[in-house]
Amino acid sequence: MTPTQNVPEDRIQIGQLRSAYGLNGWLWVYSNTEPMSNMFDYLPWFIETKAGWQTVDVKRWKPHGKGLVVSLKNVSDRNAAESLIGSTIWVAKSQLPKTDVDEYYWSDLKGLTVLGLDEEEQEVNLGQIHELFETGANDVMVVRATADSVDAEERMIPWHKDVVQRVDLEAGRIYVNWGVDY
């Protein structure tokens, strides 16, 4: 682990160091990649700690139960591992595969303004995408109200072909077939 100022501008979060595992510096790691082991294809990792940005090198990793554990270079005991708990893991976005047409990384969708329909079928601002999560059937967008949205409601809108009509990353907007009263 080394302090760094060379954090990629195009970085994307791919996981988080969750908790210490054992006495030899291993950590449980949460992965945002699919499959979860893909996070080890994108190295080096940059982690954001209380002390600032650090570059970390993965020594070893292994599946354990339903999750993953990792051993990092220069993290050799439980105390060192515990100091990293909660650190987010980032990589250069340029390392990730390009998306196909109508495919998006969640990080590209967060913060987009969501435009839906009112009772008269007029376009209205429903808020901004705050986060996304999986349900098994389809992904769900958590849309939080903003100062200029139609109301103060938080909405959970499914990412489904019948709902999501168009995504305009350049304009920072997503158009949905979703009413104010849903």
UniProtKB/Swiss-Prot annotation:
Q: Name one GO molecular function term.
A: ribosome binding
What's a single GO CC term here? Answer: ribosome
Concerning Pfam families, the annotation shows: PRC_RimM, RimM
Is Cell membrane given among the entry's keywords? no
Keywords assigned by UniProt, alphabetized: Chaperone, Cytoplasm, Ribosome biogenesis, rRNA processing
The alphabetized list of GO BP terms reads:
ribosomal small subunit biogenesis; rRNA processing
Matching Gene3D superfamilies, A to Z? PRC-barrel domain (2.30.30.240), RimM (2.40.30.60)
Q: Give the main location.
A: cytoplasm
Q: Where is the PRC barrel domain?
A: 101-182
Location in the cell = Cytoplasm
Q: What does this protein do?
A: An accessory protein needed during the final step in the assembly of 30S ribosomal subunit, possibly for assembly of the head region. Essential for efficient processing of 16S rRNA. May be needed both before and after RbfA during the maturation of 16S rRNA. It has affinity for free ribosomal 30S subunits but not for 70S ribosomes.
Can you state the subunit structure given in the record? Answer: Binds ribosomal protein uS19.
Family label: Belongs to the RimM family.
The name under which this protein is listed is Ribosome maturation factor RimM
Give the originating organism. Acinetobacter baylyi (strain ATCC 33305 / BD413 / ADP1)
